[in-house]
């Protein structure tokens, strides 16, 4: 009898321990949102609003460089929704088996040069030069003033934070912006990108968010980052001209004329949009589509982050989108904008 009782106790203990183990290892049943590192705060706000409206469980956003996240997603991480700042990350070549063939652009942003409130005199001098250029009305004098500002910025007297162009679109756009500046102010597209390399003026990291701490500590003087990220992180910033900021959708053709080479190949300029898509083979396909469908019309709060919610989001697709998205197109709430690049 005693042996029987002991055996029963042992079985119970084993079952309890196994149950505990299963509880620990059990995967989350909530939606998993992967988002560009600069937009974690905005994505978390969207997630909270969606949860409050629907009651659906969504995990806090997982951030990283958009190109790096696309690679991780293609390798099978349990992502449901992908919020990226680069349309090319939704291509089949980027997402592999997770490619769904569609994405919507729902908000616009722009590139800025951020600096810390405790900036030193050299940084403040360069800020002043950009301010002078911005306020100059005469066109030729304005170009000369911007040339002077960029000559000082790229002289090596301060270090500039630029994320890796192959892992983070913010870094790609920083180099594209410098290429455009070279074309406009020096008649030599690669002038400023070569100059910062020769003067060892750049501190790089995998994504722009990793460079905020060095900026605040004074290890770098400036950081190329999106305006919304600068605002959410409490940074001061220089607004760049429309030609250099990728913040003017009417200049799309102009931006596309400039290219920069990364490990993924030749990349061209484009207006900065924040995109979202439900991934193929996701953790909860129906809920993923519902989350993306929720964004249009419920993203006006993004203006407080310095973003511009699109009055009519743009659909990019190579495959037939889900019924809910098609319904929004039919109702005129979303407009077709073209294919996703290969």
Predicted regions and their residues:
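Residues embedded in well-ordered beta-strands
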Residues: 105, 110-114, 275-277
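Short, conserved beta-strand segments within well-ordered enzyme catalytic domains
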Residues: 34, 82-84, 105, 114
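Exported/periplasmic ABC-transporter solute-binding proteins
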Residues: 16-19, 23-67, 74, 117-119, ...
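Short hydrophobic/aromatic-enriched beta-strand-loop microsegments
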Residues: 81, 101-105, 237-241
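Pocket-flanking alpha-helical
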Residues: 65-99, 231-232
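Short, Asp-centered acidic motifs that coordinate Mg2+ and/or phosphate
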Residues: 13, 79-83, 221-222
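Structural alpha/beta surface segment adjacent to cysteine/selenocysteine redox centers
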Residues: 89, 108, 117-120
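N-terminal Sec-pathway targeting helices
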Residues: 1-14
């Amino acid at each position: 009898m005693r042996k029987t009782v002991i055996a029963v106790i042992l079985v119970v203990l084993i079952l309890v321990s196994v149950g505990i183990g299963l509880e620990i290892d059990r995967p989350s049943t909530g939606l998993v949102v992967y988002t560009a590192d600069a937009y974690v705060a905005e994505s978390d706000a969207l997630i909270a609003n969606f949860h409050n409206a629907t009651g659906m469980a969504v995990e806090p956003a997982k951030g990283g460089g958009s190109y790096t996240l696309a690679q991780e997603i293609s390798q099978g991480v349990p992502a449901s929704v992908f919020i990226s700042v680069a349309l090319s990350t939704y291509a089949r070549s980027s997402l592999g088996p997770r490619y769904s063939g569609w994405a919507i652009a729902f908000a616009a942003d722009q590139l800025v040069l951020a600096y810390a409130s405790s900036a030193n005199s050299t940084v403040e001098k360069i800020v002043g030069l950009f301010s002078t250029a911005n306020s100059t009305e005469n066109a030729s004098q304005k170009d000369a003033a911007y040339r002077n500002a960029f000559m000082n910025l790229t002289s090596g007297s301060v270090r500039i934070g630029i994320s890796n162009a192959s892992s983070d679109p913010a870094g790609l756009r920083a180099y594209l912006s410098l290429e455009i500046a070279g074309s406009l102010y020096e008649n030599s597209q690669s002038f400023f990108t070569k100059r910062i390399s020769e003067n060892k003026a750049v501190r790089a990291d995998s994504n722009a968010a990793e460079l905020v701490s060095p900026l605040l500590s004074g290890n770098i003087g400036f950081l190329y980052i999106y305006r919304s990220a600068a605002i959410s992180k409490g940074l001061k910033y220089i607004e760049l001209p429309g030609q250099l900021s990728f913040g003017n959708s009417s200049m799309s053709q102009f931006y596309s004329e400039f290219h920069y080479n990364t490990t993924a190949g030749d990349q061209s300029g484009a207006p900065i949009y924040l995109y979202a898509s439900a991934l193929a083979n996701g953790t909860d396909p129906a809920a993923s589509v519902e989350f993306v469908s929720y964004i249009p019309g419920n993203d006006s709060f993004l203006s407080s982050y310095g973003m511009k919610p699109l009055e009519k989001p743009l659909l990019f697709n190579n495959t037939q989108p889900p019924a809910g998205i098609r319904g929004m197109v039919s109702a005129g709430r979303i407009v077709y904008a073209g294919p996703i690049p290969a």
